[in-house]
Regions:
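Conserved N-terminal entry element of GNAT/NAT acetyltransferase domains
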Residues: 1-11, 153-159
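Conserved GNAT-fold acetyl-CoA-binding loop/helix
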Residues: 17-43
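A short helix-loop-beta-strand connector motif used in the catalytic cores of GNAT acetyltransferases and
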Residues: 42-54
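A conserved beta-strand-loop-helix scaffold within acyl/acetyltransferase catalytic domains
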Residues: 67-74
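Conserved acetyl-CoA-binding loop-helix of GNAT-fold acetyltransferases
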Residues: 93-106
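Conserved active-site alpha-helix within GNAT-family acetyltransferase domains
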Residues: 98, 122-141
């Protein structure tokens, strides 16, 4: 099967949002999806909060990746955080996931970025095996991820 990874354009927003909803369903998190396509487009294409990639085959979007830039104070250099990577079920195990990572690794190389990081749900064994097969190391043994959102974030603002 032939496919192409490319940077997303504003014309891709509806299909990206559809794929995000598919990912949320797969991850059993559909109830957490609250965005509108307009908000999503504004965040990616106007506010530059993140960047998007699309994988196409025969003119049809079959996967996407969302990433943003990070910074390591210890290295004094930037990196990429991969927020989402998703390939439609019927197109998995055909090299698309690896192609997304290769595309992102090339961005890292071209821009002298020293890290490519992401997280994965602990029950997602197929993805864990895939990531480890590429040489990725599990960081959760040394680091914990924390989040403030919603009411707790608002409380902090109002302290």
């Amino acid at each position: 099967m032939k496919f192409q990874i490319r940077k997303a354009t504003e014309g891709d927003i509806d299909v990206i949002c559809e794929l995000v909803r598919e990912l949320a369903s797969y991850e059993k998190m559909s109830d957490q999806v609250t965005f509108t396509n307009e908000i999503f487009a504004d965040s990616i294409f106007n506010k530059n909060h993140a960047k998007a990639l699309v994988c196409e085959s025969d003119g049809r979007a079959i996967g996407y990746a969302i990433y943003f830039y990070t910074f390591s104070t210890f290295l004094g250099l930037g990196g990429i955080y991969l927020e989402d990577i998703y390939v439609k079920k019927e197109f998995r195990n055909q090299g698309i996931g690896k192609a997304f990572f290769k595309f992102l690794a090339q961005i890292c190389k071209d821009e002298n970025l020293k890290r490519l990081e992401w997280c994965c749900l602990n029950w997602n064994e197929p993805s864990i095996k895939f990531y480890e097969s590429m040489g990725a190391k599990n960081q959760s043994l040394e680091w914990r991820t924390y989040r403030l959102d919603g009411e707790n974030l608002e409380k902090l603002v109002n302290l």
